[in-house]
Amino acid sequence: MLSQHEYGAEKSRDFEAMRAGTAMDRRAGPPVEIRPSPSLRLGDKAPDFTQDSTQGPIHLYEWMGDSWAVLFSHPSDFTPVCTTELGMVARLKPEFDKRNVKAIGLSVDPLSYHDMWARDIAETQGVELNFPLLADADRKVAVLYDMIHPNAHATETVRSVFIIDPNKTVRLLHTYPASTGRNFDEVLRVIDSLQLTDDLQVATPVNWNLGDDVVILTSVRNQEADKLFPQGYKELKPYLRITPQPSR
């Protein structure tokens, strides 16, 4: 394992080499052929896997148990946007816990880099890394989840996020440009919507947040709606009926 000083010197050399357009892959080994995998879609079964992490080997399905999961990838360790993202996820752990959600991050960097980067995150973001970070150095998970574009640099995952429910079904997938950090409040908002609408015959309208009014599904007839929503509802159109958010 590199010391902090040795790693800093190595990264400095790498940065200068990249600026000159001659950077070598910092991970040893022959070039890896990235073969496109079938793209995941909403409603697909989330691929299971076993991979090393900062909290030991992770077998996804066993690790999740009956929980929801947020799996998110980042392009590289020791990068500014990713550092702020991981700090935010760590700070939001009580919110994830409240919703029975486990967060797990991923990059194709080795475990030794993750361990060193965790110290930087604690120093700069003021919070310890309190969730596992997958060391997907063999790109196994990245390929399963289509996180590496076949025409992109094979050593960097795209900035993706997946919400997986307790049935191991993909409920959301979203990919951001490398320059844009994710909004994890929005991730929580989507989880709130999914957990609410899984149990009730409602959908959540534009810019909805927990506690706001919801809309009644068009499949529910008015006679049934009268029983299901005792707080009443406002019918703006036969297909647009607004009701206070019911309790689950």
Give a label for each model feature.
Residues L2-R248:
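Chalcogenol-based redox active-site neighborhoods
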